[in-house]
Amino acid sequence: MTKAWKFDFGIGDADVGYTKITDKTDYLPERGYGFTDISRVTARDRKQPDSLKRDMCIPADASFRVDVPNGNYMITVGMGDWILPSCTTLKANPGRLLFHNKAVTAGQYVKESVAVYVRDEALILTFSGPVPRINALEIEAAPNAINLYLAGDSTVTDQPDNGFPYAGWGQMLPRLLKHDVVVANHAESGRSSKSFINEGRLEAIVQEIKANDYLFIQFGHNDQKTDEPRYTEPHTTYKEYLRQYIDGARAVGAHPVLVTSVHRRFFEKNGQLKDTHGPYLQSVRELSGELEVPLIDLAEKSKRLFEELGEEESKSLFMWGAPGEFAFFPNGVEDNTHFQEQGAIRIAALVAEGIREASIWPLSMYLR
């Protein structure tokens, strides 16, 4: 029997079959669910018909935790307010964007279903937005969902909350996919195609991935580094390591997809973007043809985007912040490699565009 959890939020009576959650329901290990900080939660009861719709919690950048076994889950969120419009953003641990500013008119109630991947036996859902609401939450195991595994570096990874607004494009990809697909982001900061394998990270994916899943592979930023644990030669060892990812996926009937490295933000004097990856990009393109692996040329797509924005405006995509602009960077930050959240959203959209253009089927069917 499929395990499921059903929660009714607010201060009215609980709906049949649902567990009641109020603004006083704090997380306790023995309980296994609750808000991690109830000071950021209020509750209202509009005293209208329908026990799920009449009352709600208002989570002002608040997180709700449910202890669950590792695996894939479909979550369905009910949102609405009888008398006020609402607008809610939902992220899953850590910082994976599931939906953004979901607007619901006053008197309406909507359900939004999304898929999540849990690795640490805890599902943490963070609600924010201009006027957030949560009326109901259903969590159901989804063992038959398609997994989209990501292997890559810091430009792809789920960046930690204490680095906000740092974000990898893999964090933003879930909002672009229907609930049939779960994004399993195994990308890790500082890794090259070589060190990712030598640390056992590819093996961890191979142990999980199944037939008809996908493995997206983006390396190159750190393969250029000269230290022995990470460096690969672009025409030889770089290709050899990338082949291991492709072979690992194909061995179980999964589908590998190569992604060229997203560009850094460095411009020539003539306004053209400087290519800091050089032969690594061409090697990925060559390998795609040699092994008949679908290719998303994110390097070319990001080049066009950055050049269109120009040297100054493109800063808005990257971690460029004045002193005091970002809470975790009081002295400011100037980073031409890593994205802030809005930039990662734009790059994830380019990846989704690449899925369509490369006719990666049936994955392309599940794009929103």
Please annotate each region the language model reported.
Residues 1-161, 167-170, 329, 338:
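Compositionally biased, intrinsically disordered or flexible polar/acidic segments
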Residues 6, 183-185, 292-295:
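Conserved beta-strand scaffold positions in the cores of enzyme catalytic domains, especially
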Residues 16-19, 193-197, 306-308:
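Short, solvent-exposed polar/charged micro-motifs at secondary-structure junctions
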Residues 92-94, 179, 252, 291:
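Short, structured coil segments at secondary-structure junctions
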Residues 104, 155, 190, 263, ...:
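Residue-level detector of flexible, active-site-proximal loop/helix-junction positions
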Residues 130, 140, 144-150, 155-247:
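Conserved SGNH/GDSL esterase-like catalytic core that processes O-acyl groups on lipids
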Residues 201-345, 349-368:
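Alpha-helical cap/lid subdomain in secreted, periplasmic
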